[in-house]
Amino acid sequence: MDFLVENRPDLPPVVHLTLDPDESFTTFTDGVALARNAGADAPLWLHGTNPERSEYLQALGLVSNRSLLQMRCPLPTPKSTLETRAFATSDIEDFVRVNNRAFDWHPEQSGKTPDWVAEEMSTDWFDADGFRLHDIDGALAAFCWTKVHTDPEPLGEIYVIAVDPDFHGQGLGRQMTLAGLDWLHGAGHTTGMLYVESDNEAAVATYDKIGFTTYRTDTLWRADVEVSQ
């Protein structure tokens, strides 16, 4: 079990509880007790949901209105038909614009700033070559940003992927996913991973067709459905 309290300015902390499928129920309830001690109004992300765990949280009076699927696929996958290029510092403003247009509805990925991008670029895992961009007529149309994990196992993640709304309906989402997966395979990875909102039916269907399957379900629980995420 992994337990983390994420503190946020002017908002209740978010508690993250990560459990393996074979963790004992006692370990789970102990983790929930720790989460409740962080504050009764603290939202709880349960990373690794199953029916028994959900029933227990419901019995405590918690409700869930959001779930994420962690999906994985074996590599390699078919190659993308798109020509992509690596990210450069000069792309920051265009990336922020496309990201915020594509994710204006998203609780975490919306409202990104150049400063946020700079912070991500300063991390040990950042690799500009693994941040693939696709231009149409000189404008950034889509991007696929990958992230490599080494602990507890080597894993290549599609970290953020988006298509500018002006270019929807051209199949760019699928092709950019394939471009990112191809880069990860070229970097030596045999498994690709991503997170997607469970109710994003179009995205889930796209990933299903590529070969992704659901590896884990993460659910957000809270006592008051009006509390900000």
Description of each model-found segment:
Residues 44-46, 158, 192-196:
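Conserved hydrophobic beta-strand within the GNAT/NAT acetyltransferase core sheet
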